[in-house]
Regions:
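Active-site mouth of glycoside hydrolases
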Residues: 1-2, 7-9, 15-18, 25, ...
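Residues that line or immediately flank small-molecule/substrate-binding pockets and catalytic motifs
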Residues: 53-55, 149, 189, 273, ...
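Extracellular glycoside hydrolase catalytic/binding regions
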Residues: 126-130, 134-273, 284-292
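Aromatic-rich peripheral "rim/lid" segments of glycoside hydrolase catalytic domains that contact
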Residues: 253-347, 361, 366, 375
Length: 513
């Protein structure tokens, strides 16, 4: 199940009355657009390190804590819109009081993880969580609480602090369950929500209603092996897995491969984020343009250029907020087909369905030389003329994409499958190369789409620049062969009956496109 992220944080929601009305008009417009996209969940982020958002520093007389009713009223509005448009809300405590991660995203003082050392800050977080339970224990539209974002991520104290994080989770759930026995808690691992080994026991002993929130971007290899540890933990503890944060820059192949693996293992995923500046190359739902004079702000902040006057800077910021209006944004449609596997998109041939048994069959007796999906017994080969750097993904400089230059080699008796979710009529093609004729059988949902011979096909080595990564060469050009036309979603199975071919992409094009 695909969702995306909505940030609910101090700089946007607590500027002034004018900006409050602007932002909430934009958010409500977004929910209408979101409904059209047929997405099912919105993740609402809170930077509670800015404690005045929900909990006020000064305690009211005879109270343990005082709460900002304006902020809760805003959240109430958002939850009402969620109900109106039938979109579940995952409430994400993105930044705990005093900071929990050691990285700037939690807005903590000096980027330290003071939550674990400061008893008062941890208690304030418990109080805030209890207040959320009191207010929202009966709000069915809240699908889960995501707690807490990327804890203990950049620190030499990870081993020392992890037991304190475990205590925080256990005590938080214990106290919250006295008020709310219904809602799911999604708990984050350490090191950018990737290390989950300490979820080795029951964290919700009375109600067993918890799961793991994992984060992954393009640095993570899109294969089952990357998820094996957390999937095994979830099975052992009988809990759910949710990819609480993911996305990436121009990573179409990575996204359509990784997200299908998650779907096969019944894990939802949340796209960061809902809106990005035009040209950022991020997998957002909407893009916006910045004001013409925005460079005056960034030149001053980043390069030490002349400082705009207060009035001038405020006018630029006001214009920036106006640019965020949904009706001034552009749908970032280049990503949607790859995320949902609907419309016009390509699947890398090496991005075949992951589950064993009927989804694929390789017959090689050696691990493939590309070092990817080693357990599937396929020959994955680098395209002609491509030689990966010896250090691979550990090489200095920008992340390289050797998998973009890997082809799936299928010989007689081998097959691979691909899930297609387009519901209308579309054409299925493949790009491939083969030294000789190849006899193949292609079926979708068990019905034969093509059975016959594909002719010999060449491979054109290119020195062109990669379409998405300026520091890399583009993949080689392969011949394209049309397999047939289909109506409706299904699982496409490509099997070689005789001969051998190397496949580059599965190409889906809606009829007339």
């Amino acid at each position: 199940m695909l969702s995306c992220s909505l940030l609910f944080s101090d700089p946007f929601f607590l500027l002034n009355t004018l900006h409050y009305s602007l932002i909430f008009r934009f958010v409500k417009q977004f929910f209408k657009k979101y409904y059209v996209f047929s997405l099912k969940i919105v993740k609402i982020y809170f930077l509670t390190q800015k404690t005045r958002i929900f909990i006020i520093e000064e305690k009211a007389q005879n109270q343990k804590a005082s709460y900002n009713e304006d902020s809760f009223a805003m959240l109430d509005d958002v939850l009402d819109w969620c109900e109106t448009y039938q979109v579940y809300a995952v409430v994400d405590f993105h930044a705990a009081t005093a900071g929990q991660s050691g990285i700037p995203c939690d807005d903590g003082m000096d980027n330290g993880q003071h939550l674990y050392d400061d008893e008062e800050s941890m208690e304030r977080m418990f109080l805030l969580m209890e207040e959320f339970m009191r207010r929202y224990k009966d709000r069915w539209i809240i699908g889960a609480y995501d707690c807490i974002n990327e804890p203990i991520s950049m620190t030499p104290r990870r081993e020392e602090l992890t037991p304190k994080l475990v205590y925080f989770y256990e005590e938080m759930i214990r106290r919250c369950r006295k008020i709310d026995q219904k809602h799911l808690f999604l708990l984050n691992g350490t090191q950018f929500s990737s290390l989950t080994y300490f979820f080795d026991h029951e964290f919700d002993p009375e109600y067993h209603n918890w799961g793991i929130s994992l984060h992954a971007y393009e640095m993570v290899v899109p294969e089952v092996a990357s998820l094996a540890s957390v999937l095994r933990t979830c099975r052992e503890q009988k809990i759910c897995l949710w990819m609480g944060e993911t996305g990436g820059r121009n990573e179409h192949a990575w996204q359509t491969t990784m997200y299908e693996i998650l779907a096969e293992y019944h894990a939802g995923y949340n796209l960061w984020c809902w809106k990005t500046v035009e040209g950022a190359g991020c997998a957002s739902i909407l893009n916006f343009n910045v004001p013409d004079e925005w460079h005056l702000i960034t030149d001053y902040a980043i390069n030490g250029a002349a400082k705009p006057s207060y009035e001038h800077a405020q006018a630029i910021w006001d214009s920036y907020l106006e640019c965020l209006a949904v009706d001034k944004c552009k749908e970032n449609t280049q990503y949607h087909p790859y995320l949902l596997r609907e419309g016009n998109f390509e699947i890398p041939a090496i991005g075949y369905n992951a589950l064993p048994m009927d989804s694929h069959r390789g017959l090689s007796d050696l691990p493939n030389a590309a070092g990817y999906r080693l357990y599937d017994r396929f020959e994955l080969v680098y395209e002609k003329g491509y030689h990966p750097e010896p250090a691979g993904f550990a090489a200095p400089g920008p992340i390289k994409h050797p998998r973009d230059h890997v082809q799936l080699q299928l010989g007689a008796g081998e097959y691979a499958s691909y899930t297609i979710r387009e519901k209308e009529t579309y054409t299925v093609s493949v790009t491939y190369c083969a030294d000789k004729e190849v006899k193949v059988q292609v079926a979708i949902q068990g019905e034969t789409l093509f059975e016959g011979v594909m002719p010999p096909a060449g491979e054109k080595v290119t020195s062109d620049v990669h379409p998405y990564f300026a520091y890399e060469t583009a993949p080689n050009t392969l011949e394209r062969f049309t397999l047939g036309t289909v109506t409706g979603e299904g699982i496409l199975k490509i099997e070689v009956l005789d001969g051998c071919a190397r496949f580059g992409q599965i190409v889906i094009r809606k009829s007339g496109k």
